[in-house]
Regions:
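N-terminal export/assembly segments and adjacent metallocofactor-ligating motifs
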Residues: 1-4, 35-40, 54-79, 84-289
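N-terminal cofactor/phosphate-binding cores enriched in small/glycine residues
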Residues: 1-53, 62-67
């Protein structure tokens, strides 16, 4: 029943996404449920608990508030606290949820962590920084459920578990098709696209349709003074449901390329000449007739 509460910001989430199946990895969405009024309360993960008749759902009891705060504190003990210099500062779900549950400091002492993990900068459009991974599985599920490529997987167990590409290769050495579904799904910047940080500078977001093929994928284009900064796929689009391909997401720099044709042209005496749209349509009509 998380879908009923998420739009109202009553229940925070980290491992849930609108285009992914419920998973229950983070437990940040926990709520208390009773089968009758003033009945015995049971703490459940709201992302994969179905709504049933007679339920009494409590989203903001002191118990669940404390639980959520403890979970986020534990997550932050193994996460870089470099928000001010992070590429997704201001556009990070973990940052948003931490503020929502009231985190101001972490009570737990510093211990073993994964902050030493190196970045993967092999891909021209995406970066991977697993020191910021919170093991929510969203990237793995996006690769599996949305794109169907099964490139990403979880390797190891317990504290040593980590996301790998292929057989623990780099992005470019793996079978990644560069769709960017994982970067859009990631709630931190463990996997991010190189344009994601620029979206914060956007002054406008425009809903449009991709022109690369005839599928008609919906896109959300972030711009600043007419310059395209980044592109995301909206989750509420009926056609592509929060997904798009490599071209739709990353190949937008053609729009202001100097080689792009901006006016109709007709070949006259072996050379292309700029004409009006009326002349171009008349030319096409004559050819069709």
């Amino acid at each position: 029943f998380i879908r009923r509460f998420k739009d109202n910001n009553l229940v925070p989430t980290l491992c849930d996404a609108p285009n992914l199946d419920p998973f229950g990895a983070c437990r940040v969405c926990s709520v208390e449920v009773a089968l009758e009024k003033n009945g015995v309360l049971k703490t459940l993960a709201s992302c994969h608990t179905p709504v049933s008749e007679g339920q009494h759902i409590y989203t903001s009891t002191e118990t669940v508030k404390t639980l959520r705060k403890n979970i986020i504190e534990l997550v932050l003990t193994d996460h870089p606290l470099d928000c001010l210099t992070c590429e997704v500062n201001g556009n990070c779900e973990l940052q948003t949820v931490a503020a929502q549950v009231g985190i101001r400091n972490v009570r737990y002492p510093e211990g073993d962590n994964h902050l030493y993990r190196m970045k993967d900068l092999s891909h021209p459009y995406m970066t991977s920084d697993l020191s910021k991974c919170i093991n929510c599985y969203r990237c793995v599920r996006a690769c599996d459920e949305v794109q169907g490529e099964f490139v990403l997987s979880m390797y190891g167990r317990g504290f040593d578990s980590k996301i790998i590409k292929g057989l623990d290769a780099s992005f470019m050495e793996s079978d990644c098709v560069s769709c960017g579904a994982c970067s859009q799904a990631c709630p931190t910047s463990a996997i991010s696209d190189v344009f994601q940080s620029k979206a914060i500078q956007a002054t406008d977001t425009t809903r449009t349709i991709c022109t690369y093929c005839g599928v008609g994928c919906n896109l959300e284009v972030s711009t600043n003074n007419g310059e395209i900064l980044s592109i995301r796929a909206p989750y509420d689009a009926e056609v592509n449901q929060g997904h798009t391909c490599l071209k739709g997401r990353f190949a937008f720099q053609f729009y202001d390329h100097p080689d792009r044709l901006r006016e109709p042209m007709i070949k006259k005496n072996g050379k292309f000449e700029v004409v009006t749209w009326k002349e171009a349509y008349n030319f096409i009509t004559k050819k069709l007739i």
